[in-house]
Amino acid sequence: QSYFHPPVLQYFVNREDLMGELDGCLADGVLHRFGTGEFTDSLIWDAWTDLSSDLVRRFAGQATSILELKTKTARIDHLKGLPHGGRTILSWSLNTERVIRNEERGTAPLERRLRAAAEAVAAGYPVAFHFDPLVIYAGCETDYRRVVDRMFDAVGPESIAWVSLGAFRFMPDLKATVERRFPHSSIVYGEFVPGLDGKMRYFKPLRMQLFQALCAAI
């Protein structure tokens, strides 16, 4: 919410321009990874638009690049029957139940995300998982290990394209925004220091300790 002003979602309707530029990139024969969930949820518009379905079909027709659809939802029924050719990776952002409950309001619970991932695998899709943002709090290592265990209970490692880790970081201006809009949130009150990129990041030894714990669990 510190990147965009005003902090509202925008959906661009010039899809022909998008597809034309995309076809140009796909035609160069170079491996690309395209994603629509960098600053938003890839599937959040799918109740009103068929963009994700259109993209899945588009990528199924080529053999060099991949599409990643990243989400915190569990709404994938509209994607299950599509001809995807294994060129689309459905990925989920995972977190502890405490973080989901307190900081990710309106998103699918962990169990529903993992169930959707299992359904995606059954439909032939490769899947991926993002432990991002990792939030440090008392007992977090134990909680994140449980999430890893539940992830592998839901999906076998042979179906997972990748797992990524990223600790919570934010632009300095976001702290005031969180305090104003989400006064009950404590997410911005950890041991943060300014990073080389200007973002506030957890003190490096704390980050490394949590990364190492998750890597060992994975």
Where are these regions (language model features)?
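Short, electropositive alpha-helical surface patch
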Residues: T49, S91-S93, C140-G156, P183-Y189
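Alpha-helix N-cap and loop-to-helix initiation/capping positions
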Residues: Q10-D17, A47-L51, R105-R112, G139-R146, ...
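Conserved radical SAM core fold
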Residues: T40-I44, A74-D77, T88-A108, P133-A138, ...
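Conserved C-terminal portion of the radical SAM core fold
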Residues: R113-D173, A217
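Structured alpha-helical segments in the cores of large, soluble enzyme domains
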Residues: E21-D28, H78-P83, L110-A123, L214
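Conserved Radical SAM active-site core
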Residues: Q1-S91
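A general structural detector for well-ordered alpha-helical segments in enzyme core domains, enriched
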Residues: L18-E21, L51-L55, R112-A116, D143-M151, ...
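Auxiliary Fe-S-binding modules of radical SAM enzymes
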Residues: F152-I218
